[in-house]
Amino acid sequence: MLWRNEITEFMDQLSKYSQEILKTFKQLRPSEYKQYNEFLTQVTPLLQKTSEKIPELVDHIFNYLDNVEKICELLVNASSIIISSKIREQVKHGMSFSYKADLDSLADILSQKQYVLMHLSKNIAAEYFNTCLNQGKSKLDLKAASVFYSSRPRTASSAELYRKMLYAYGSPQEINYYTEKARNKTLDVEESDSMAIIERTARHNLSLMHPLEAMGLTFGATNTDADPEDLKDKTVINLTLPQATESITYHLKSLMQLKKVSTASGLNTNILKAFDNIISTPVKKNKMASKLAPGMDVVFTSDNGKTFFTKNILSKNMLAGPKERVFAYNNLISNLNNSCFIQNHNDFLRQQDSWPFYDAHNFTNKFLMQPIFSGQTRPRLQGAMEAAHVETHLTAFLQSIQPSRPQDPSVLASPKLSALILN
């Protein structure tokens, strides 16, 4: 599989780089060197236990994906230690100019490969799912998958697989409908009444989902070992969608092909395109947060760290419970600063046991997202200008968090991944 080749290549690059500075690194930073070695030591047995054979049982599937993500995380942690700027500067002291340049070049390549490795961990599930389909596997047990997925730590790749399973197997009528509709349009055949019923069912099922959930995205929080008492009155952003390993960045090209996302969830296609322009990037570290709570992962959003969530608060039901999702969603809405999304944030926070869904309203071909709480509609319908205001601000926000792209495609680990990230 692709991921095994990428991990092997990354380990080779890390080994070559570490050999250049290993002696000095060990002398100058013995504690970091010990931690670096521990990470690499943990990778080897995980690789040996990870078979390329596609597991049949759903619990083995999620264990399989969790195992791969652990490998990726360990390698990223190891490389982050050894290529830190402070260590490089100490190691390069007294070296020739050309050697320093070579070392910097190698470090840059390794950094780019680290970026690719983190991106790869989220796409393992997609590759796995496609392999299952190509091999003609029988339907995965959705009930077992749901139970197992909700009872263990949710990794980015397992969330991706679970989403794909729900799309593929959760509602066969929807799949049949869109397949037949495409065929009927091609053959210029009039649709039957039964197909219209299926369409209404499909639209209703999607209307019960939050727009981000309809696009396969789930809420989560970054990890930290900090005690909440230590973080009182501190300003640290700790919010990420969907997982802590990546910032608010998505690639939705495959979902954009499903017209039901925009037509049934109330999302303007221009907003979908704005999401599609965002690519995956590792979470950035906040220097101040690192001093307050070493090891904390921080995701920057537009408020520059005025609110935060900690692992201690959200880890037990990070993606499942309505309260956690309400907190996460309210924070996102506040960051976007779009009052026309919901009329009253306090009312929204009080809805602990109901998760809002959205209905589409068409104003001169503009969709305005209107929240519905417990059957009570709270409209903020002020015409096309307000709908355009929502779209403009959301698009601007997404563009503001778009990460820089790798400058040299040759540093990426494979042509396939290069095409995925750069396109």
Curated annotation (Swiss-Prot):
Q: Which domain of life is it from?
A: Viruses
| GO CC annotations, alphabetized | virion component
Which keywords, in A-to-Z order, does the entry hold? Answer: Late protein, Virion
Location of this chain's protein in the cell: Virion
Q: Recount the UniProt induction comment for this entry.
A: Expressed in the late phase of the viral replicative cycle.
| Sequence similarity | Belongs to the asfivirus E423R family.
Q: What is this protein called?
A: Uncharacterized protein E423R
